Amino acid sequence: LPAAFDSFTLLHLSDLHLDADPAYPAALIEHLRQVTYDLCVITGDFRAKTHGPHAAALAALAQVRPHLRGPVYAVLGNHDSIRMAPGIEALKITLLLNESVPVERGGSTIHLAGIDDPHYYQVDNFDKVAAHLPPEDVSILLSHSPETYRHAAHAGFDLLLSGHTHGGQICLPGGIALMTNAACPRSFCQ
């Protein structure tokens, strides 16, 4: 990282499934009060169901958003619908749908990029998102699924942040994932 980004901290949230339990937004807000960070990223799955109404998830996100400090960037997950995008962006959360943004600090720049979830709609476009990234700059890719790791590496991204595996759905002692819900190495799902 450029020296200007020493001590720069990202808060990475994923798989919030905000409409799964009415008590969840308040619990999340309580945890958010205890952390310090410069920028927040959310790697999808704002809602619990993969189809149907999404108003409850957006209402819960509206409760949480005032407690997220700094800029907030996100990608959609396999539970989310593009129909949610206007509601998410109305909350001042920037969705990165096969696009990137520069993040500047102290005269230096890193790039934050996001791709669409590869599962249902299969509209993730690595060529488009990586096309304008300077190879000498640090680039971070947001992807809901860690299964994109090979594409991310070939596209030249320095870091991939993803969710989807819920830390490995079922883990043995020591954090060894038995079930990952992803077609990638288990070590990528922790």
Outline where the language-model segments fall.
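Soluble catalytic domains of enzymes that build or remodel membrane lipids, polysaccharides, and related
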Residues: 5-12, 18-190
